[in-house]
């Protein structure tokens, strides 16, 4: 959620109209922290008191060691050739104004150049945004270590086997921070992207990792181990009020309370 959405994007391409109902009919919306509640209130067109920092149920899995082990066992059973590899997950968001125009520029990331620059124990998982129809070109010589999982495997589950995340403006950074995963932000089109979408925070001070602007800078940072990972813990603390794995319980209690009030 670093990028602006909903009513924050009034007047922007792909943004809503002032008269659109969108999310305004919600009785309540739940968020991960008080820090971001104001942004969701603005984006959804809700009053501040309708946005509650209960924590997000889907993040409970990141505090569940048994779930993590089950996912890891299943992944390596499915892809045994990756068991002893250093796994890099490339998960960029889409460009364009929405699902109908979404794309990821083919010339932004070249698998062959990326893999040639890194050690032989490196494996790459590619997970494009569901809106993107494009698929990466994977050279034959790398198909044992480079997997396009855009059409399979849940993104959050892939984080449990990830040693390094490469992304850009995607909200996956929030979930990745819960596992203290090192991150690199490949923002080759940062200024153009900002001009079209805007952000709730200054991107360069917001992200919990090093920003790179070219594929060469990207591989150089990986080889050097230069991820600026010290930014991850304060990021996690800022954007998650609850790290106890009990957000589902809080939301369930909230729903039951609402049901009782409606009777």
Q: Where in this protein do the model-derived segments appear?
A:
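Active-site and donor-binding regions of nucleotide-sugar-utilizing enzymes
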Residues: 1-65
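Acidic, amphipathic alpha-helical patches
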Residues: 19, 111, 155
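A short beta-strand/loop micro-motif in the catalytic core of glycosyltransferases
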Residues: 27-33, 124-125, 165-166
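Helix N-cap/beta->alpha junction signal
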Residues: 32-35, 128-130, 169, 214
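Conserved catalytic-core segment of nucleotide-activated headgroup transferases in glycan assembly
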Residues: 58-138, 212
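Donor nucleotide-activated moiety binding/catalytic core segment of transferases
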Residues: 125, 130-174
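Catalytic binding pocket for nucleotide-activated donors in carbohydrate/polymer assembly enzymes
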Residues: 139, 171-239
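C-terminal alpha-helical cap of glycosyltransferases
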Residues: 244-263
């Amino acid at each position: 959620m670093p990028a602006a959405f909903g009513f924050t994007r009034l007047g922007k391409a792909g943004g809503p109209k002032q008269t659109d109902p969108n999310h305004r009919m919600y009785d309540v919306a739940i968020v991960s922290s008080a820090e971001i509640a104001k942004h969701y209130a603005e984006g959804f067109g809700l009053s501040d008191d309708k946005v509650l920092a209960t924590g997000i149920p889907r993040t409970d899995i990141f505090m569940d060691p048994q779930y993590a082990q089950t996912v890891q066992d299943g992944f390596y059973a499915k892809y045994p050739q990756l068991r002893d590899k250093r796994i890099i997950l490339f998960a960029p968001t889409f460009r364009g104004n929405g699902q109908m125009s979404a794309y990821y520029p083919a010339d932004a990331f070249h698998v062959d150049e990326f893999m040639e620059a890194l050690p032989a124990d490196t494996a790459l998982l590619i997970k494009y945004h569901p809106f993107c129809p494009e698929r990466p070109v994977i050279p034959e010589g790398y198909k044992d270590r480079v997997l396009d999982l855009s059409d399979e495997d849940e993104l959050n589950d892939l984080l449990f086997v990830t040693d390094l995340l490469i992304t850009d403006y995607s909200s996956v950074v929030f979930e990745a921070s819960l596992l203290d995963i090192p991150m690199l932000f490949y923002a080759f089109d940062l200024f153009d992207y900002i001009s079209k979408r805007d952000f709730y925070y200054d991107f360069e001070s917001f992200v919990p990792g090093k920003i790179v602007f070219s594929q060469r800078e990207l591989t150089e940072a990986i080889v050097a181990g230069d991820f600026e990972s010290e930014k991850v813990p304060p990021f996690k603390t800022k954007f998650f009020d609850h790290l106890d794995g009990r957000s589902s319980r809080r939301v369930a209690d909230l729903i039951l309370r609402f049901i009782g009030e409606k009777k």
